[in-house]
Amino acid sequence: YKTTRLSDEECKRLLKLLTNVMNNEKPYTNPNLKSSDLAALIGTKSHSLSFLFNQYMKKTFYDYVNEYRVEEFKRLVNETDISRYTLTALSEKCGFSSRASFFRHFKASTGITPSEYIKNNLR
């Protein structure tokens, strides 16, 4: 087993592809998303993506994906009529597989609970 090393240029290229896929295809809405799925979407190997996350971006795959999920939740709150959804249903639409995981990541990311965010952002 050899360690994958990627140049800064290669990391920048992969990150650009990854950002494009995340923003346009929203694979993070799949609660069962694996890093191998993301690697396939951007046409790279899993260990290259792992290097990108751990060495270049200094974060885990799950932290990266959950950042997008939290942002998606915020977008839904701001752009749609959420009154007919429960918090659990909204979190599932964003790709979280459990309410507990959603609350934990949301609070870690924003410093407030999802309910507080909704209260502060509903017009």
Task: Please report, for each region that a protein language model flagged, where it lies by residue.
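Ser/Thr-centric signal marking residues that sit
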Residues: 101, 110
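The DNA-contacting recognition helix of HTH DNA-binding domains
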Residues: 46, 98-100
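Membrane-proximal linker segments that couple transmembrane helices to downstream signaling/catalytic modules
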Residues: 1-89, 93, 105-108, 115-116, ...
